[in-house]
Design a protein with these regions (language model features):
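Helix-to-loop junction immediately C-terminal to a conserved catalytic motif
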Residues: 53
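H-loop/switch region of ABC-family ATPase nucleotide-binding domains
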Residues: 194-195
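Helix N-cap at the start of a conserved alpha-helix in ABC-type nucleotide-binding domains
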Residues: 169-171
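Conserved ABC ATPase "signature" region
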Residues: 105-129
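Conserved ABC ATPase signature
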Residues: 133-137, 141
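Catalytic Walker B motif of ABC-type/P-loop ATPase nucleotide-binding domains
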Residues: 158-161
Length: 228
C-alpha cells in the first residue's frame, strides 16, 4: 500500500438477488487521484459507489479507508438531498457541519467558512443565487449546489454519482475541473460515475470500466491522456 492511499478495494463482489453486478474488483485510490466509473445504464455504477460509501452490503471482499478527518467519505447523490425550505448559501454551509460543534454553529458559522462557501458558489456559477430559495433553482443549479455542499465538508474520499448529468457542456467541464482541482488541492481522491467518454478522457487519471461482454467484470486501467 502506498503512503498516499486513501481507499483500498479488495476482491469486492456485489449482487442484487441472483444477479451479480461486480465480481472480484480490486483497486486503490490515492491522494490527488480522479477515478471515473464507466458503464452502461444499469451496469451497477451507483450500487458500487454506495458500496464504497458503506451504504450497500458487500457479497464478498472488503473496502478499507485510510482517511483521518471529520468527514472521511462524502457522497454526491443523484437525488441531491437538498433542504428545499432553505437558501442556497445555507444549504452550502450545511456541508461544514461535520467540522464544527453544534454549539459553535448555533451562533453562526465562522466568517472564514462563509467566505469559502461564497467563493465556491461563485466559481460554480451560483454567485447571484446565494439568498435564493433552493426550490426555485433549476435542476442544473441544484446539482452544482449539492456539489458545493459536499466539497465544503472537505471529505478525503469524494464519491459522486453522475455529478454533471444535468449540466450543459460549459458547466459540466467547469464542475469536473473543480472536482479535479479539489482532489489535487486537498490531497483527496474523487471517484465518480460518468457517461460522457470525452469527459472521462479529459479528467480521469484512472478508469474503471465494466466489460461489455461480461457485465460483472470490471477493468481497471490508467488513462494515458492525463498520466502523460
Amino acid at each position: 500500500m502506498e503512503e498516499s492511499c486513501l481507499i483500498e478495494v479488495q476482491n469486492l463482489s456485489l449482487c442484487i438477488g441472483d444477479r451479480w453486478l461486480v465480481r472480484d474488483l480490486s483497486f486503490s485510490a490515492n491522494q490527488g487521484e480522479f477515478i471515473a466509473l464507466v458503464g452502461s445504464s444499469g451496469s451497477g455504477k451507483t450500487t458500487l459507489l454506495r458500496a464504497l460509501s458503506g451504504d450497500t452490503p458487500l457479497a464478498n471482499g472488503q473496502v478499507i479507508t485510510h482517511a483521518d478527518c471529520p468527514l472521511p467519505v462524502g457522497m454526491i447523490h443523484q437525488d441531491l438531498q437538498l433542504a428545499e425550505g432553505s437558501t442556497a448559501i445555507k444549504n452550502a454551509l450545511s456541508g461544514c457541519l461535520y467540522r464544527h460543534s453544534s454549539l459553535k454553529t448555533f451562533f453562526g458559522f465562522p466568517e472564514e467558512e462563509k467566505k469559502r462557501a461564497v467563493a465556491l458558489l461563485q466559481k460554480l456559477g451560483l454567485g447571484q443565487k446565494l439568498n435564493q430559495w433552493t426550490s426555485t433553482l433549476s435542476r442544473g443549479e441544484r446539482q452544482r449546489l449539492a456539489i458545493a455542499r459536499t466539497l465544503l465538508g472537505q471529505p478525503s474520499i469524494l464519491l459522486a454519482d453522475e455529478p454533471v448529468a444535468s449540466l450543459d457542456g460549459k458547466w459540466a467541464g467547469e464542475t469536473l475541473n473543480t472536482l479535479k482541482e479539489y482532489a489535487k488541492d486537498q490531497q483527496a481522491c474523487v471517484i465518480c460515475s460518468l457517461h460522457d467518454l470525452d469527459q472521462v478522457d479529459q479528467f480521469a487519471d484512472t478508469i474503471i470500466q465494466v466489460d461489455p461482454l461480461n457485465h460483472d467484470k470490471w477493468e481497471v486501467k490508467c488513462n494515458p491522456s492525463t498520466k502523460a
